[in-house]
Amino acid sequence: MRGKWNIIIWILVLLAAFYCGMYWYANRESMEEVHKTALLVEEEISGPDSENRDETDDSLVQERFLEIFAEASSEGDAAIQKVKLFVTGKNAYFFLPSYCKADSIALYYDEHQYALAVEERIIPSGTMISVDSAAAYAMTLTKEDGTKAEYELSVMQSENLPSIFITTANHSMDYINDMKGNYEPGHLVCVNDSGGTDCDAALEKVKLHGFTSLSVPKKTYQVDFSKEQDLLGMGSALHWIFQANAYDKSYMRNKLAYEMFRGMTSGYAVESVFADVYFNGEYAGNYLICEKVEAGVNRIDLADNAAAYTADSTKGQVLEEEDIRYYDTQDADTSGGYLIETQNVLVPSDLQRMSEEDSYFVSYSGRYEIRWPKEISKTQISYIQDYMKQVETQIAGCVTEEDYRQLAEVIDMDSFAVMYLIDLIANDVDANAYSTFYYKLPEHQGGKLYAGPVWDYDRGFGNEERNVMVNVNGYWNGLCEALYRNPFFRNRVRDLYHERFVPLTETILRAFLEETPDRLSLSVRMDSVRWQNNLDRLNYSYDCFDDEVAFLSYYFDERAAIASEWINETGVYHMVTFTVPEGTSKSCFVRDGELLTASVLSFMKEELECGIWSREDGSVYQQGRPVFGNMTLYGSTEILE
């Protein structure tokens, strides 16, 4: 009996499968039509740009801003700003500034293009709806032909931070982002976190800024006002930098370096403020709004009078000789101030960091780009070139107390000591190679050379494998490191460490590391959603903001402990010298019993252009062995198979 029922069941299963197959075959054309329609909806709603996206990268295909705007009332007197809807996959987001009343928003869109429904209720354009940032809502866009696209809508809001809204002439960032040097005029509105208007002014230029940062989707920008403006209480100026911090998942490394320098120096230090930035209504992310390192009244005051900073260009011709580039102006006055920036790699590609109009000179330690005067004459550039060669020669020969005393009449020792301390702790891979500034005061202000201000430390503080190490001076060695060989300079570094760095760490820096993450957290959440699939992080980044912040705090404490041992000479360190047949050599220091890291070996190979490292007896150096004494490693151009 049981066998009979089994046969009946199998017959029924086969019949069901047969009829399902027939049903699919009969309806396959209509199902394909539905699939095509769904694709058409996605294509039409996402806009024509989607056709030009990389079809193999789903994140790029699906991420875009739609012409749907949210408007929330302000807590203060600032004009209400509309923000665009951002969609990624089947998720949609409105990123609201901190000053808004976010419990309700008005939605605006083109009703001739499609209808918008939230929780199955049609929302006419201009209608106010209640929202909760903790909730998600079903949103449907329906075109006139009935095709639909469905999303899960979330409303996110920042807090504690000011918001900056920039509108460009073409209402798009495409042209600006296409190439460095492209720019558009525009308008900027800055609103503080309580809804008050901080700045409302015309922009002469919005353009890209930086070099390495150009390779990531979240760009760094420079904005130039038509007239000087005081932005976020940092003093009136024409030029401002919006640092994206795209390489830094903590968002805090640049600000940490700037605050360290500000707290320890009596010279000029960059001011900066975190803000949420919107371009043409599109949320661009969390940015660090910074003073540009330049000569100016509220910057580094190097001119005889304020009018010199805004004087029209003479449009002189750019001339170039073997080791200098200058303008054919006839200015023979060399007594003014100078601002220079290191561009230390003496290879042709290094010039790619500068435009054809940028002046430079080559000294013993490398190439320096001229930041002031704007159009430097041959007389002036020859003067500052000779001056820097003299300084470098004095530093190289600074051994005795008398050498130190004479050098102190030429350079500001404290600023050099402070920069040494910051580079020691930050351990930035670009230290002394790029973005390292020096300025020489005019003769009527004493004429001394100052180190600083520090700039661009987002790849420091453990953000690359090369600087996650206990090695000292495992980066480019500059003037400060060369000067550290003098015992009297070491004494000054030690004094400043105790007089300024230790108290600063116990108060301002510790508070910064503990309190800033809370201030940034909601803004960072929005930034992470906006750029989640496009962030180009470095070797030692963690997956989330909280973990990266914890690591930054840990790394800072570890490097501060190493600095204490090194400066106070309480720890045992050994010098490892790297040398090549041509006679060039570099060195770093390793704590007793620690490893000479692979990243330092790789860095030295790249720096000295060698293939392998060998000991004095010719044996190949075996990585991974602890260092217990001074040693010399010899480089070879031979490539180790």
Protein language model regions, located:
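Beta-rich interaction/scaffold domains
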Residues: N6-I9, Y19-E159
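A conserved hydrophobic secondary-structure block that centers on an alpha-helix together
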Residues: L232-N286, T379-S382, K389-M413
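Secondary-structure capping and domain/repeat boundary segments
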Residues: A79-K90, T570-E641
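N-terminal module-boundary/linker segments of secreted carbohydrate-active enzymes
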Residues: S133-Y137, G146-T197
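ATP-dependent phospho-/nucleotidyl transfer catalytic cores
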Residues: A295-I425
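Conserved oxyanion/phosphate-binding beta-strand-loop segments in alpha/beta enzyme cores
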Residues: N182-A244, S377-Y383
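Middle-to-C-terminal accessory/interaction subdomains
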Residues: V216, S365-A433, Y439-L441, G446-T579
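Extracellular interaction modules
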Residues: V131-A136, E144-T147, Y183, L214-K218, ...
